[in-house]
Design a protein with these regions (language model features):
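Catalytic Walker B motif of ABC-type/P-loop ATPase nucleotide-binding domains
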Residues: 103-106
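H-loop/switch region of ABC-family ATPase nucleotide-binding domains
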Residues: 138-139
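Conserved ABC ATPase "signature" region
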Residues: 57-74
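Conserved ABC transporter NBD signature motif
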Residues: 10-24
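Conserved beta-strand-loop-alpha-helix hinge in the C-terminal portion
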Residues: 158-181
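A short, surface-exposed alpha-helical micro-motif characterized by mixed small hydrophobic
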Residues: 144-146
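Conserved ABC ATPase signature
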Residues: 78-82
């Protein structure tokens, strides 16, 4: 979906327009599970400003995101001095500032404690409210229940179930997940 792997068949449509695979990166921001592959600058603040300096009131937005993701005390630190979870939240912060309409998050809560998982959930909801389409690849059911409006359950790359997130379907999702993981 983000264009990293060549698709052999099918077409991509965004806002009703056919988009060539080579142009997907113009529309999609992909946050990798391994954050080290997406960090390029010498400070947390500069990482968030990278490519976004023309955004009006960028400094104010950077401060807001640092606070939202519990990174304000690390704003001057080198990204490689951060813990894995802090790096993960930093790359999500960069996605928040991106002007791309589609965000893909790969396992955005792996290794996070409850407070930081909730901070990432707030960031996802912030992006959704800003009009971004957010795809989340995860095994974290608590996180999905806090962020998703729809869940696609996949097995071996095939959609097994497509559910609107409601209290009734939350139970079905948990049950399906437990059955699949438990091997019933």
């Amino acid at each position: 979906m983000s264009g990293l792997i060549r698709c052999r068949q099918g077409a991509f449509y965004i806002d009703g327009k056919n988009v060539k695979q080579q142009k997907l990166s113009d529309y999609v921001y992909f946050v990798m599970q391994e954050a080290d592959h997406q960090l390029y600058t010498d400070s947390v603040t500069e990482e968030l400003r990278l490519g976004n300096k023309r955004i009006p009131s960028i400094d104010e937005k950077v401060s807001q995101i640092l606070k939202m993701l519990h990174l304000e005390n690390f704003k001057d630190c080198h990204p490689y001095a951060l813990s894995g979870g802090q790096k993960q939240r930093l790359t999500i912060g960069a996605a928040m500032l991106s002007e791309k309409p589609i965000i893909v998050l790969d396992e955005p809560t792996s290794g996070l404690d409850w407070d930081n998982m909730c901070a990432v959930a707030n960031a996802v909801n912030y992006m959704r409210e800003a009009g971004k389409l957010v795809f989340i690849i995860t095994h974290d059911l608590e996180f999905i229940s806090l962020t998703a409006s729809r869940a696609l359950l996949l097995k071996e790359g095939i959609i097994k179930d497509d559910l609107q997130m409601t209290e009734q379907n939350n139970f079905k999702i948990v049950k399906n997940f437990m059955v699949e993981e438990g091997g019933e």
